[in-house]
């Protein structure tokens, strides 16, 4: 097992996006859905079990771990102090689980710095949501189009509209973090 694998994580208390790269090439995307679990310790157990399963099933030994850094300041219309503290607490728990399972000290990357490093420009005036712009960028970055899971909205004003599954955005963010982390490692060696 000589291949070097890197993992990227977009951690939140509801969905965790995970990307796996072999050397500097995309390998797979995963997610962990925690939306139906309220207790943080139960969430941590689910995360540990799922990441263990991924590592075992894929038969990989991870050399690098990159995690999207948490918000460090308030922005208008964004998260409250309570939300940021809860996310920071959970991020720490998950980071420790990742360290225990992989033996790798995580490298934290600011999402805006990661996007800048990759040349991702978000068009704030576009009719396309910024999260969908990230998915589109990932699709353009891949040699083959990724088969993103879709759903048909069943009610409300968007009834009948086909949209990405909610976890796709987290997987795309994890891809960006991992790819930027790998480039960062290469540039600094």
Which residues are covered by each model-predicted region?
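Phosphate- and other anionic-substrate recognition elements at nucleic-acid/protein interfaces
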Residues: 1-189
